[in-house]
Structures are given as structure tokens and as C-alpha cells.
Amino acid sequence: MRSWNSLFCLNSSRPPGHIVYPKHQAGHTGKQADHLGSQAFYPGRQHDYLVPPAGTAGIPVQNQPGRPEGVPWMPAPPPPLNCPPGLEYLSQIDMILIHQQIELLEVLFSFESSNMYEIKNSFGQRIYFAAEDTNFCIRNCCGRSRPFTLRITDNVGREVITLERPLRCNCCCCPCCLQEIEIQAPPGVPVGYVTQTWHPCLTKFTIKNQKREDVLKISGPCIVCSCIAGVDFEITSLDEQIVVGRISKHWSGFLREAFTDADNFGIQFPRDLDVKMKAVMIGACFLIDYMFFERTR
């Protein structure tokens, strides 16, 4: 079976909508990783999610004033039916790359500054820009457990997704204070939640819709560490028998991993997945980043 790194390289060279999963081997009784369509993911809830129509990406647009330069923006495709404003970009893709920017203040003085991220498609075109909205005291006193508001904006600076994380104890031995993040799209309108599920050994989360109904599961390793390699978190069906996607923390090199918080992530999901659930998976990725990969000052 191909390694995740080879799959990531293969998928990054394919056009949107062509995700490659490991083929099912004869005699294999483990989890299935085949793309089985959106109906396999939400048994009995197909009416809650609309399958977006197919489309093609266009020519990259120019960089907008006041935003990071050097990377073209993905052009906006036609919005699907009942699509929240700004989420139409997600209807055309099956992979997202998230790159955290290096903050000079953190490198030189070990002060925790506001995290900022670039969110790109598999072609390297920027889709969104994400910025943490917290104050200095909260960042440096609460560390990785801090509450935050993460504002995700499009190419014209319009806030299209808001992530809200409340203050919770970041201790795996305390099942009464499990982590949670709320995803809003547009701001003020919840579209889903990601909640930590207590387990004595493994890292587990549950993806919920706007009604707080369980939709998908996320399972990670027993020990979450990216000291020498990447880390994968599998997105599965509720019975954890079908793998429908993956959140991966990519190895960024020794110096970057040792001296900065600038992490790189990849998210894979079916192209025909509802855009709201794709936005919720983005929220799950940021929650995982803050919980496990923020350095303790």
C-alpha cells in the first residue's frame, strides 16, 4: 500500500476532483479507504447536505492589496445552491494545504504572537487567509490551551469563516473539560462543531453538524509527536470502518520544527462533500494544531 507521502505528492499533481486513495487489497479486513461517494458518509442524513455541481478552476487572480504577496489567489467558482457566501471555493477542491507563517517575534524573544495561516489548494493557489484574534496576555499565559477567535478571510478581505474556541483545560486525564471548537459560516451562523472525545490512549474527535448531531469521527495516534516525521489523523464514518479523509501534520524540517510554531498541514476529503462539512474539517485542523503542535512557552 502506498505511503501517505506518496499519495500527497500524487494528489498534488492532479487536477481538483481527482483524489487517490489506496486500493482495497484482497483479504484485507481493515478500514476501507476507497472513495465511496457522499451517501456512505451520512447514512440517513443525505437531505442535510447538498452535493455541489462540478466545475473547473480558472486562471489565478491577482494579489489583493493588504494581503501577503507572491502567491496567486484561486478564482471564485460559481456558488452551489444554498452555499454560504465565500464557501464556493471549497466546492471545487478535494485537498487543502495550510501553512502557518513564521513570526519573527516568536523566534527572537519567545513571545507568543498571533498565529497567521495561508490556506491553499493543491495547485498552490491561495484560497483564504486566517488570523488569530487574541490579546497578548491570553496568548502568553494560557499557551496552547488559550481561547481564541480565528478569522478566515477571502481574497477581498471578507470574513467568510469564524472559528471560536472556548477556554478548556488541555489535559487528557480530565474528561469533564474536553476541547471544542465552533465553526461559523458566515460569521455568527454555526455550521458545525468539533468536540474532543475522551479516550484513555488515543486521540479522538467527533465532527457534528449545526444541530450538534454526530456526522464523522477523527482518530489520531496514541502519542502525537512530529519530532521526526508527520502525523496523520484519519477522518472516518461514525462506526470508524470507512476512511473518508485525512488531516496530516507535515514534517517541516528540524530547524523549523525546533524553533518555530510554523506548522504545515494537509486536509483531504471527497470533492463532493458538502462545503459546510469541509469548513468544519478546516476548524478541526486548527483545533488539532493548537492542542498538539503549539510550543509551550
Curated annotation (Swiss-Prot):
Q: What is this protein called?
A: Phospholipid scramblase 2
> TM spans, by residue?
277-293
Q: Which residues are recorded with the post-translational modification Phosphothreonine?
A: 149
Q: Please give the superkingdom of this protein's source.
A: Eukaryota
Relay the domain remarks. Answer: The N-terminal proline-rich domain (PRD) is required for phospholipid scramblase activity.
**Is Membrane included in the keywords of this UniProt record?**
yes
Q: Print the keywords alphabetically.
A: Calcium, Lipoprotein, Membrane, Metal-binding, Nucleus, Palmitate, Phosphoprotein, Transmembrane, Transmembrane helix
* Cofactor(s) this protein requires: Ca(2+)
